[in-house]
Every structure is written in structure tokens, then in C-alpha cells.
Amino acid sequence: MRLLCCGIFFNAVVSFTFIYLFVWLTGPRGLTVAQAGLLGGIGGIGLVAGNFTGGWFGDVYGHRRALLAGAAVSGSILCVVALLPVAALYVALPLAQYAAGVVRSANSALIAVGVAEGSRRQGFAVMRFASNAGFTVGPPLGALVAARFSYGWLFVADGIATLLFAVYAARVLPGHGAARAPRPPSAAGAPRLRAELRARPAVLVLLAAIVCVDLVYRQQYSTLPVFLGDHGFDARVYGWLIAINGGVILCLELPAAHALRRRAPLSMIGAGLLLVGLGYLALVPGASLGTAIALMVSLTFGEILYKTTATAYVADRAPAHAQGRFQSLYAGASISGQVLAPPLGGALYTAAPGLLWPLCAVLAALAGLAVLWARRLPDGVAGRDTGPSLETGSPRRAVAG
């Protein structure tokens, strides 16, 4: 799994395409802001859909195969997307994002099935560390490529790197499960996903809470910079706030996951969601440098507490034959704010700017309280393997590499 995380870091470094997508569409491609926004929104829907449904491919065909296929499709499209006419972008961009979402859910599923229960918090923390470190390096590298060559080369570089990630993953990930449990020839007798979820109401409460809090959490990328600008703060202040978030997470998330590994997961998650709400509550009195820093510190510590723990909790409660679909549900919930936060937050900020931060604080607090209440609900017990092989879900063959 460490080798997979190395590949995730490399792939994250070059995943800068969609950071500069809006600039490329409104600049070299000559689209209006409205057209660029529509394309970006459609791409975001594709990403969320890929996260929500990618686990099904992994459960049926194998998580390794899902990762390789998703990376191959996404990389191939990105290599040629700069050459496509505008009309074709309405199909190519959401398809590339959908495939990227499948890769994201497959990465999580591979960590879930490759790390023993009890160690998954640390495993997912390592994965998040690799991803966050790559995203820290990627944007300035992308800016250099765009300045030295052109924005079109960003897509080529991203596409080639994604294809190389697929080749690398094919070499380092075994094509069979190292640990296998007896299972029938097919998973026809396995309970349906709905039945598995009904048997785990605490997981359902958690997923709903994550959708709510992600809508709140991602306001930092949409309405927060507008709010700061309206109160006289320039882009440098916002940039430093985001840097605080990234730096603290890189430094503290891994040791925190290790130190808190024996703490009750729902208590940790609930506390993290409450911290997210507390952060936005700091903005209610008004905008100042102190309140902005308080917001970001509270958001960051809330993220450290809930994101890794929630991912591991869902993995620990998933039945083996549906691990991919459980990870897909969490992955989709955890990124849903990327589509929901900008339009909903922007509309509320335009109509009633004084209500945005109080409502964000209340929504996150209610999500946190719901998770804390869910501790009294049955959360299910992960079942024996009744589907694909435990590690990758791929047929046995000689280990590559």
C-alpha cells in the first residue's frame, strides 16, 4: 500500500488541469464566464458521479481493474482534450472527470481491503498525506508549465502522467488477493447493498452528515474568498489561509491518526464536524484577520479529526463483498460539496450575506450532533468475503514486478 500511496502522490502532483480549467476556457478557448461555469459544473457532476458509482466496478470486476481502467480513460482524454472543439468538451470533460472519480474510489477501496481493521485510520492518513502533499506541489508547477509553454500543455502533462500512473499501478499492485476467504462462485447470494445499509443505520447517518458538512466545509473555496475581498482583504491573505490549512494537515494528520487510533470513531468524527461549525461561527461577528485565522485553524483541526476517521469507519463497517460500493458512497458524499457549495453558498451570500455563516455553523453543528447521537445505533459487523478477492478483486496471476 505504500507503493500505491507513492503513485497517488505522483498523480496528485500533476492533477493541476482542473485548477486552471476556468482560466483556460475563458482565455485561450474564448468562452464566456457563463459557458465556462457550465462546463466546470458538468465536469464536477461527472467527478461526483464517478465517486458514487466507481465502487460498483471494483466490487464486480476488481478494484485494481477499476483503477487501471479509470486511469487509462481519464489519461487518454486529457492528452487530446486541448485539441477538441468546444462542443466536444461537453462530453469529454465530464467523462474524464467521471473516470477520475472511479480512480479515487478505487484508491480508497484498495487501501480498505489491503490494510487490516484497526490500522485503517493510519492507512487512510498516509493516503491523504500523499494526496495533499501532491496537491501542494502541483499548482505552482502547473503555473510554471502554463507560463513557459501554454495552458494546453497542462492537459497533455496531466494525461501522460495519469497514463504512467496506470502503468505503475499495474506493476506494483498484485493481480490477486494475498489473503482469501472461502466464497461461492458468484455473489448472487450476497445481501443487496440496500439491505447492508439498513443493517448499519449509523453508517447512513454518517453519510448524510458528511454531505451536509461538505457543503459547509467547501465554502472556503467559493464564498470565503469573496467575503474576504468584500471586507478589504486581498488574494494574498486568502492564499496564506489556505497555506495554513495545507501545512498543518501535512504536519499533524499522520501523528494524530496514530495517537488517536484507539478513540471511538463516531466520537472523533462528531467532534471534528463540531469544530467545522465552530470555525464558521467565528465569522459571524464580522471579518478580521483574527477571525479568518480562527476559522481556518478550527476547520483544519476539524478536518484532521473527521476525514481520515470517517473513511476508515465506513471501511471497517463494510461487508467484504461490498467494500468498493461502501467506499464509493463515502467518496461521493465527501466530495458532494464541490458541486453543491458554490451555487448554494453563492446564492445565499448574494441574497442575504449575513445569514450564510450562521447557517453554515448551525448545519455543521447539527451534522456533528447527529453523528454523536448515532453512537447508540447499530453499526453492523463487517462480513466474511462473499465477493471478489480480499485485496484487489482481480483473478489470480503471477505478481507483477
Range-by-range predicted roles:
Residues G50-G62, L252-P265:
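Helix-to-loop junctions at the C-terminal end of transmembrane segments
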Residues M1-G44, A202-L241:
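Helix-loop boundary and gating motifs at the non-cytosolic
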Residues P94-S131:
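Cytoplasmic helix-loop-helix junction between adjacent transmembrane helices
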Residues A49-P85:
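Conserved MFS/SLC helix-loop-helix module at the cytosolic interface between two early adjacent transmembrane helices
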Residues R65-C79, G159, S267-L281:
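Structural signature of the two symmetry-related core transmembrane helices
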Residues M1, P174-L206:
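Juxtamembrane intracellular "pre-TM" segments in multi-pass secondary transporters
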Residues G44-V48, F52, F135-T136, G246-L254, ...:
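Residue-level signature of mid-helix packing/kink "hotspots" within the transmembrane helices
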Residues A82-L93, V284-L295:
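Helix-loop junctions at membrane interfaces in 12-TM secondary transporters
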